[in-house]
């Protein structure tokens, strides 16, 4: 609630206030260095806001996919790395075992017994993502997931919340249902729909990012592009 954050003298997030609904999948966009990753880290509790408060419900389980893969034990076998978290992940279709999940992520049965140190950088990234998903989060924070997270894999989350930083237009159009855009002075503007809907809304208003930057020197006042319906306490986390 009313969260602000300044880093190294730069106001990155200015009086941000939002209640996340159960079914929301939020895409955070903006220029490099504007505060997108900072916002995710505050949501995960890795850093604290300078003012305001982030409230997290008692039943929330957060999974956080950072931009960089954390250190791994290179001697550990792929299947062991995943089973350290869980033997299976529950879905509406039933339990999916760690081995089955690995196959979904392109690790065939033989590869599952490969030492982690033998994996390529991309394979380690996929393995890291799977480990986050095996924790069965109901809120998933993704910092530039790139091509590692395909659309079918998102079904594992079922009705969970997704908050993602991404520059991938296809991903944003197919995964998110609301865009949060950094538009200057630490302000976030919210738009209903995916990235194409965001562009269309900007065009309708006659205020593309380039035009607004020229007119206002990159400073945009905070607003919500589409009115939000009143939220029930039961719908929020």
Predicted regions: what is each one?
Residues 1-237:
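ABC ATP-binding cassette signature C-motif
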